[in-house]
């Protein structure tokens, strides 16, 4: 947000103080305390371009040219003497387009101009080509303001019953939800830490991040632009009905429109921004007027940006189908319960479904529990969760439960797993039990080290790199002769396992396993779906020594091997 302090500034010296009132119970997790975003002082002439007053869109893109529309807002006493000049530069600093447009007697507070870039380079996932537009506001022959806007040339399209298209290419969202806290580094913006997080997620095969459940820092969005990572930019975790005592519900009536408008205006030029989210699991899902609030917020966004879809993280399928909140949204976003996708598709008009929040599988890095069984809300005396990736929460599921829906239902456009990294707060299933204080949901732990689950997702999502990962570790003194299952996460279709040189058999991913035609409400109780995506030896017994796995390609050729001791 910004605050115009002009009426309060006096001649000569001034003291500007930023004071914060961090109350308890402001959030359901740890959002940070104190001043954790950067603050800037911006000076403007009386004739100027307002904050976030330049909007750039690329409504037409071909191989030969890109049409660029620049809308420049301005504040001036004499509008007929105003002109806006925009020069576009490529990433080599070369000028590629220019326009100068004068205001007319009929101009209100905005000048619109069209430019064309020949042979445009597109911004894309992992290939983030960026242009810069320098816009100057003239009053007569005098430059009164100058704004530099970084943007990308790219297109987004939703096709009902088909999917999501980026630059004319169909894609699936392979996304993660991320809180903004940086674990032991704290919540203050740290560009190096954010860059590392994005880089690790890209290595896992992630192409999109949902900024749950807060508006992201400008540095975060800029890094996503520069690194080629898509963003689903989220606004609120709470509307007018409270979840916590001192949450956003206290401010929603007076501030929601302004805050949401500022969010969209701030980031509408950023090519990494794929979609907007108006909320997450809000209590209004279960009231009759909930759809009206959703429409109100969606309309606010559409006043500022018509180029991106608007979604909402909804976790109560029955309620949002009944009160029409789901039907109201441009893009349906469902949190968990993928077994409800088919019903939602039958009843709703959008004919596309996004897994806006999925999985919530829990695990602790390097911790393995026996026997290896699928469990919900499992608790142990050491306050840990098993890294065999077979445990989840009462409302959630395992990764493969989402993958099989994403692959077998053509109207799904992808998912955002909960979460990419562990974070402070929400230590489900232990909740407030001491000393548990951080989540178990992440594919990467609080220290920034990958869990086994990182490699499970990598084996499925990263098509460019080889993945061959063995779990668990093989130091089990005292478990000699006991059943100790071995899992292999790999992008290859099959592998053979050896313990101390003796073959334990070959496993192949079972592609015959399909999503059931008639699904039951709830999750499976077994690990049948996992056989389509993981290689599992459930009966191996521990003996000290060496575990070796040999992976085979589609032709049955041995192409990779790995050992642990």
State each model region's role:
Residues 1-52, 77, 85, 92-95, ...:
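Accessory beta-strand-rich segments of carbohydrate-active enzymes
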Residues 316-345, 361-377, 420-441:
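Substrate-binding cleft/loops of secretory-pathway carbohydrate-active enzymes
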Residues 29, 42, 46-61, 67-69, ...:
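Active-site-adjacent substrate/metal-binding segments within catalytic domains
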Residues 10-11, 71-159, 537-545, 553-554, ...:
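Extended acidic/polar, glycine-enriched regions
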Residues 226, 251-362, 397, 460, ...:
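Active-site neighborhood of glycoside hydrolase catalytic domains
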Residues 7-10, 15-79, 150-155, 163, ...:
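Non-catalytic, glycine-rich low-complexity segments
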Residues 5, 72-75, 409-565:
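Carbohydrate-binding surfaces of carbohydrate-active enzymes
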Residues 1, 82, 90-113, 503-530:
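Solvent-exposed beta-strand/loop surfaces of large extracellular or lumenal domains
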